[in-house]
Amino acid sequence: GRGPVFTARDGYISMEAEHTYNREDASGAKWTVVPYMGRTLSGIALMPYTASTDNAKLTYCFKANNVNTVKVHVVTKSTLDFLDKGGLVYDVAIDGQSPLSVNFNKDLNEKPENIYSVYYPTVASRVVEKVIEVSVDTSKDVHYLTIHPQDPGIVFEKIVVDLGGYQKQFLR
């Protein structure tokens, strides 16, 4: 089924990760909502974590006009690089543009240069927030944001689309 179409309030759109417009499962894994994981509602992840993520994606629909770029804040659980591959990666795209790849946890480890500056603060906050600047087609009012995990084990908690009015908040 199709889910909500979000509209901006105070210059940004805040979407719980489970409130997708559409979900596409992977061939061997299904999107699963994990209640109470996250600061505000839940998390959503492909399960089982051992399966390929192949064609899986989450799509969010939002309305925005008179902006040509947005900042997309993707909030994930502070998952460690359990595959030991130099970080786990997801892709972000708007309106079918070429996806931007985000390695969200490459420095989230106990190496001496990261332990105090990255690892401890991130584990304490339990989330990793990455910001991706994406251009949008100004001729359209309705936009589709797609997130594709390249790696398994990524738990998405919240997505914020900043149209220019977002201010960082603890609960996001």
For each predicted feature, which ranges?
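Extracytoplasmic
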Residues: 1-172
